[in-house]
Amino acid sequence: SKRRTAQMQAITATIQKEQNQVIRHADAPTLLVNGIAGSGKTSVLMQRIAYLFYQQRESLDPSEVFLITPNPVFERYIEGVLPDLGERNPECLTWDEFLRGLMPPERSGGQAPASLDAFERIDEACATFSFDQHDFKEIHCNGERLVTVGQILQVAAKFRNIPAGPHLVTLMREELLRRLDSRLKQLAASDKVLDEISMLTLDQQVELFRETFDPHDESQVREVAQQYVDLRFADARRAVENDDWLRIDRIGMRLLGVENLVPVEWLYLKMALTGLGNADAKYVMIDEVQDYTVAQLAVLARYFKRAHFLLLGDQNQAIAPGTATFDQVRALFREVRGPLEECRLMTSYRSTPEITQLFASLLDDDERLSISSIQRADTAPEIIACASEQDYDRELRRVLAQAVGDDGLTAVVVPQKHQAKLLRKKLGDAAPALIDAAATLPASGVVLVPLKLAKGLEFDHVIVPDASERAFPDDPLSRRRLYTTVSRATRGITLLAQGEITPLLAARA
């Protein structure tokens, strides 16, 4: 009908206006995008990156743009999207990949929380800190001790009038590299190294030097020997350049009075002491910003010291305890980056109006009244409260059997992985396949998915097998988990409970 067409045109114009507000936003130190479920945040992110590349096509290199995402699958996804938009890919990292690139393998694992208080104590302590002999460690490589603690202490004494911090560590690093070069020259002139070179087979020569050699005079012999030791002890040079001669753990324990540093504390301390960071990055995009802790965001803000930040997320999809609230995100980036600008995306093009209305009912009045959907009306959400366990079991099996015959893909979404295992045990042969992080979703059928994996995905239908108060009590975290669960559905949703439905939805039951 003409009226429907006019409505669609008006809604489409609203979406374009909302999204263009982000895509074409003037450059800002920090741009925070708070978008409801299904509002096209991923699309906006891709188009924003493409827009920046186009705007700065003469000066912006993909290596200067970083995308931090909690989802490792996202990297594969953007490999196809940005080239289609005519652009090369930015650097794409998960938090774990970011840590692994900067920390020793034995230190980079784990998600132990840290507070900004610890960072403030590190900053305060570094202002008056002095190294002692226990803060240093030797550099060994291929059986050779190349930098000793005694040498590091000599270098520290040379610069004793300079306070601890990036300037001092830079001076010490440069002096240690000079001493390492001197040590490698001595090794290159040693009989031991000359004997090792003379014993190399042709295959070993090619493996090391990518060519064979046959030196004819002493200068050529010295040149080959220097190349040999430089290659053989390249890891030692990297260790000095990376400040691996500092015992960050030991320094941190002394500064903070703790027995062990969590990974983000370790990394923050190394940044504070050495100036570790990326000064070349121009833009950093953090997707699903509500999934990060304040400490993680503080580390990213300090590491990418000169970059402008685009922060995308949905404050109502913070489904893990301890992550940053949007108020905390605003406060942090205003403190470290200055003015912060914000855009809202309030129109859903993923879910039907009925589903959109259901997850919007979980929000505050102001937010709920601003949300709309562009999809056609479809079936109303089905909310089933069963009086007995027998009734519940029968209804659950009926709903699952019906879903098997439906078109599209149905997800049975549970809050935690252990609940998925309990449900599979209860249903036996009728249980859907449990999806894990490595699995590829089928195009149709029924799958069982923990909420953590379902987040960021969409399904034609969603079944919530336990929407009781036990699973979703009336508290802010459960409210966000239910909002996230419901908003995975595009066309239909069924919620079941043995006993009363969660009070979060009681008015709709």
Regions found by a protein language model. Name each.
Residues 58, 63, 72-80, 84-97, ...:
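Conserved helicase motor core of SF1/SF2 NTP-dependent helicases
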